[in-house]
């Protein structure tokens, strides 16, 4: 589920994915590699990474770039990842049947991923 519900200025585009079915610790391992990089470099890195977390993050980067291009008219070549964060979500609780009518709890972690893209030229003018 991808949501965006922020008041944005003309220089940044955001995308948020909630309840991604993986641990926040494992997703942070991928997010730390792309923070601060350009959009094209991020796409190349994520497509070659062997981790399971890279696919939902890649989809989210594409979504944030589409928001920047279509809604704000920014150029794809000037975008960079200004903010990328992973927060822990709720645990999906399930029961695993065991012998003699018993059951064990399974807690499956989820996480929320936020990507913010900024324009290099416009962010330099504002500072």
Swiss-Prot record:
InterPro entries: Ribosomal_uL22, Ribosomal_uL22_bac/chlpt-type, Ribosomal_uL22_bac/org-type, Ribosomal_uL22_CS, Ribosomal_uL22_sf. Keywords: Chloroplast, Plastid, Ribonucleoprotein, Ribosomal protein, RNA-binding, rRNA-binding. GO terms for cellular component: chloroplast; large ribosomal subunit. It is found in: Plastid, Chloroplast. One of its GO terms (biological process) is translation. Transmembrane segments: none annotated. It holds the Pfam family Ribosomal_L22. Belongs to the universal ribosomal protein uL22 family. This protein binds specifically to 23S rRNA. The globular domain of the protein is located near the polypeptide exit tunnel on the outside of the subunit, while an extended beta-hairpin is found that lines the wall of the exit tunnel in the center of the 70S ribosome. PANTHER family: CHLOROPLAST 50S RIBOSOMAL PROTEIN L22-RELATED, LARGE RIBOSOMAL SUBUNIT PROTEIN UL22M. This is Large ribosomal subunit protein uL22c.
């Amino acid at each position: 589920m991808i949501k965006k519900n922020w008041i944005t200025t003309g220089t940044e585009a955001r995308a948020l994915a909630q309840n991604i079915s993986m641990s926040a610790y494992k997703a942070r391992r991928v997010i730390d590699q792309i923070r601060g990089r350009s959009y094209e470099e991020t796409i190349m890195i994520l497509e070659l990474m062997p981790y399971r977390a890279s696919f939902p993050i890649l989809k989210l980067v594409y979504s944030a770039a589409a928001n920047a291009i279509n809604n704000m008219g920014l150029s794809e070549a000037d975008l960079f990842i200004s903010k990328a964060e992973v927060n822990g979500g709720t645990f999906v609780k399930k029961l695993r049947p065991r012998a003699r009518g018993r059951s064990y709890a399974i807690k499956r972690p989820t996480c929320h991923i936020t990507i913010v893209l900024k324009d290099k030229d416009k962010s330099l003018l504002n500072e």
